[in-house]
Design a protein with these regions (language model features):
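Alpha-helical "hinge/linker" immediately C-terminal to small N-terminal DNA-binding modules
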Residues: 1-22
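Central regulatory/effector-binding core of bacterial HTH transcription factors
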Residues: 26-88
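Short, well-ordered beta-strand segments
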Residues: 28-32, 80, 130, 176, ...
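Secondary-structure junction motif
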Residues: 83, 114-117, 127-149, 215-223, ...
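Short beta-strand->loop
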Residues: 94-105, 180, 188-202
Length: 233
């Protein structure tokens, strides 16, 4: 009817006015972030999407890896950031785009550092430690690494959320691990010290999408910046 046509014309007119004023509709970008990824890493990976000339409206969802992959397969997300690749066994058509890798650093508050005995990594033996939850890819590597070096720290707490683990670490409750690419930021932000590093412990980061060839402008910006900046150090 006439009413629908008038409304449609009104919409078109509003759209053309918006475009003429340079107020084009922002690009929607829906991203899922696995809760095992450090918040600072997630920020550095996602930030380039907001630095594009085009206006972007980003929606971030944090959750467990399998739940996010399910959302991706239903096209409810454009991208999933994770520290593990999606497996073919899952039966979901998704593609892994490697962003980079980082070794791990061991950090603690200066007050705790003063109490540690011996050089790294021997100083970890019997020392209070905060670790990632059992489902984390880094946790499995860490358990193996500690066994290999015959080290038995005193486990004070296990955390799915790295930000919460860092908060306890900052207060001197235990030694904690963090990706080495964040050392400068973590030490400055939390007032903690690096007591040692390991390149045997590696955290990998992936952008997972339903596209084999990346076409979403935000995903293109993220993958480019990760390789050129964050993981180029």
């Amino acid at each position: 009817g006439y009413a629908e046509q008038i409304f449609a014309l009104g919409d078109e007119l509003e759209k053309s006015i918006r475009l003429s004023r340079g107020q084009e509709k922002p690009l929607e970008f829906r991203v899922g972030v696995a809760d095992s990824i450090a918040k600072s890493v997630a920020y550095h990976l996602l930030e380039p999407a907001l630095g594009m000339p085009q206006r972007v409206h980003m929606t971030c969802h944090e959750g467990k890896f399998p739940e996010l992959i399910a959302q991706l397969s239903l096209h409810k997300l454009d991208l999933v950031l994770a520290d593990e690749p999606v497996s073919k066994k899952i039966g979901v058509k998704a593609f892994n785009h490697p962003l980079g890798t980082s070794g791990m650093s061991f950090l603690c508050a200066p007050s705790l550092r003063a109490q540690l005995e011996g050089p790294f990594p021997q100083c970890l033996h019997g020392a209070p430690m905060l670790i990632q939850g059992p489902m984390s890819s880094v946790r499995q590597q860490l358990d193996h690494w500690l066994n290999k070096h015959h080290l038995q720290p005193r486990l004070v707490g296990e955390f799915d959320d790295s930000a919460l683990m860092n908060a306890f670490g900052r207060q001197g409750r235990g030694i904690f691990t963090s990706p080495t690419v964040l050392d400068e930021e973590t030490t400055a932000q939390f007032g903690v010290e690096v007591i040692g590093r390991s390149t045997d412990l590696v955290e990998e980061f992936f952008a997972i999408s339903v596209e084999r060839r990346i076409t979403h402008p935000c995903v293109v910006a993220i993958t480019k910046a990760a390789k050129a900046d964050l993981f180029a150090r």
